């Protein structure tokens, strides 16, 4: 039964819907892991002190291009 403040799908009424729920959960976990990896790489690249300052000219726009779709 669905509730007004529910964040996920309602209970499955058929075996196909149960499989769809499992697929959704699996896909969401993969998307979460990829987003976490990208965030870690961005933070590591921005916060490191071992890089050349002149090589980072276009890195800010690349961070925006990567982070903006994840936020949206």
UniProtKB/Swiss-Prot annotation:
Record text on cofactor binding: Binds a dinuclear copper A center per subunit.
Topological region Mitochondrial intermembrane: 1-14
Any GO MF annotation of the entry: cytochrome-c oxidase activity
An example Gene Ontology biological process: ATP synthesis coupled electron transport
Membrane topology designation: Multi-pass membrane protein
Subcellular location: Mitochondrion inner membrane
Enzyme class: translocase
Cofactor annotation: Cu cation
Keywords: Copper, Electron transport, Membrane, Mitochondrion, Mitochondrion inner membrane, Respiratory chain, Translocase, Transmembrane, Transmembrane helix, Transport
TM annotation in the entry: 15-45
Any one cellular-component term (Gene Ontology): respiratory chain complex IV
Catalytic activity: 4 Fe(II)-[cytochrome c] + O2 + 8 H(+)(in) = 4 Fe(III)-[cytochrome c] + 2 H2O + 4 H(+)(out)
Claim: Ligase is one of the keywords in the record: no
UniProt EC number: 7.1.1.9
Function summary: Component of the cytochrome c oxidase, the last enzyme in the mitochondrial electron transport chain which drives oxidative phosphorylation. The respiratory chain contains 3 multisubunit complexes succinate dehydrogenase (complex II, CII), ubiquinol-cytochrome c oxidoreductase (cytochrome b-c1 complex, complex III, CIII) and cytochrome c oxidase (complex IV, CIV), that cooperate to transfer electrons derived from NADH and succinate to molecular oxygen, creating an electrochemical gradient over the inner membrane that drives transmembrane transport and the ATP synthase.
Similarity comment: Belongs to the cytochrome c oxidase subunit 2 family.
The protein's assembly and partners: Component of the cytochrome c oxidase (complex IV, CIV), a multisubunit enzyme composed of 14 subunits. The complex is composed of a catalytic core of 3 subunits MT-CO1, MT-CO2 and MT-CO3, encoded in the mitochondrial DNA, and 11 supernumerary subunits COX4I, COX5A, COX5B, COX6A, COX6B, COX6C, COX7A, COX7B, COX7C, COX8 and NDUFA4, which are encoded in the nuclear genome.
Annotated protein name in UniProt: Cytochrome c oxidase subunit 2
